[in-house]
Amino acid sequence: MKRFFIGILLIGAFLILSSCNNEELFSLSKDNRLVFSTDTLSLDTLFSNTSSSTYEFWLYNRNAKGVRLASVKLANGNQKGFRVNVNGIPLSNNNGFRVNDIPVYHGDSLCVFVEATAPSLDVIKPQEFDDEVVFTLESGVEQRVKLRAWSWQATHIDRLEVANDTIIDSPQRPILCSRGIKIHEGATLTIKGGTTIYFNHDAGIDVLGRLSIEGESEKRVLLRGSRLDKIFSNLPYDRVSGQWQGLHFYGSSYQNTLSYVDIRGCFNGIVCDSSDINRVKMKLEQATIHNCQGYGVRLVNCKAELINAQLSNTLHNCLSVEGADVLLNACTLAQYYPFDSSRGEALHISSQYQPTHLSVLNSIVTGFADEQIKLPSKDSSNLSYQFSNSLLRMTKPKDRDLIHYKDVIFESTKDTINMGENLFIKVDNEVLDYDFHLKNKAFVIGKADKNSCPQIDHDGIRRKSVPDIGAFEHH
């Protein structure tokens, strides 16, 4: 029992001494300051009246003693649109947008979380808005971290129902679309050159009527996801697939024309449902469909033309032809999808719907895998296909099948190291950056058929008298 009471006394004495020592650990010296992971936190660009993702920075006490924060506050209160949380405590109306008396022990650190909602500004270009987080130490020393973001005034669309002929013409101001666009049967939506539409994750374009995209060589139309920030420091969300829903043409939709348009970062780029194969469902010219988490273009029992189109990097097939009448001329199909090794082919042909007719002229079909063209393995008596003046990454067919191939270059399937590097300017799977223009001395230069090849290329540049295979003419 005596030993028990002695133990209690020793523990009590230790706690008293520890309490005294803790009090002594906090310094009032102006020389003892905090170290911050950054002096300026940039939140990138936000559309007006939209909120950012959560950012963070850290503060560290590397002094020999503790430092106490007398207060932490925003220099402008809550007037600039920033929201701050200090070590789990939000700066809110409940605490007057400041927190007080926060100890930072020797060797300890605190995390500060920051979000922002961009203000509405009546200007064309993105405008900076800023604030500062002010840290006042118990010694009276004041330290600050600057917060910066940019607000981009956008026209907001929330579930646009196109029941009558409608024109979207917005070359100067971006359009932010939530919950998608639906074009009803009998109506036409025309999107003029220079327009950019940013789609939220739940949004896309459903076409029961008709869609006309009228881009120009110097004023392309851009359809992409709405995330303007980065998933990593070197990787913008714009390079990540599956950011929005893409374009869906239903059975009642015909005579769709899409020219000089870039469609990227979506789930399915374009899906065309089954319809009358004697009527043109879609004509795609001078277009790019890139980085899709589903199909690039899926054509189901319909009639379509793809001219000077780049279809690249898709989880499923870049182009899937499922019982259709399809013309492919001067296109580049490049399957370098980086996110999944079970990616589909650059070109997949199915005889599920019959008959199927496919004509491929002056085109590149290539990618990671040895076999980038998938033909039906079963009876294909109703399948008619022809490849002419094209580069195909596939094993050379048997003699009896060579009738379907005229003046074709079969890309060596032994090339498993420099895939794409012999053809294209850039195939960078580290930072997901690609440029499918032809590089100098690419072996497809001058190999297209001048009689059937379009006179201009994907970029609207006139082709040479001896043109190149693929969507892009080398200059």
For each feature predicted by the language model, list its residue ranges:
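Short, solvent-exposed loop/linker segments at beta-strand-coil boundaries, enriched for Pro/Gly
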Residues: 74-97
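Extracellular interaction modules
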Residues: 140, 463-467
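Bacterial N-terminal signal peptides that target proteins for export
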Residues: 1-9
